[in-house]
């Protein structure tokens, strides 16, 4: 794992950037994991969106 140097006050910004990058990586790996038919993919996408909407 690489080390990042952050200036005081930029910790929050660096954390947000890390979370964004890690989420993109997770989505990419999940997307290429296996093939889903369009109907099932749509259902999964709606299910994941509802999970985030509930907060």
From Swiss-Prot:
The keyword Ribosomal protein applies. Pfam families: Ribosomal_S21. One of its GO terms (molecular function) is structural constituent of ribosome. Keywords: Ribonucleoprotein, Ribosomal protein. InterPro entries: Ribosomal_bS21. GO terms for cellular component: ribonucleoprotein complex; ribosome. Belongs to the bacterial ribosomal protein bS21 family. This is Small ribosomal subunit protein bS21. One of its GO terms (biological process) is translation.
């Amino acid at each position: 794992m690489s080390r990042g140097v952050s200036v005081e006050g930029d910790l929050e910004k660096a954390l947000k950037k890390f979370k964004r990058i890690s989420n993109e990586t997770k989505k990419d790996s999940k997307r290429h994991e296996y093939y889903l038919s369009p109907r099932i993919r749509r259902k999964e996408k709606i299910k994941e969106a509802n999970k985030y909407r509930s907060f």
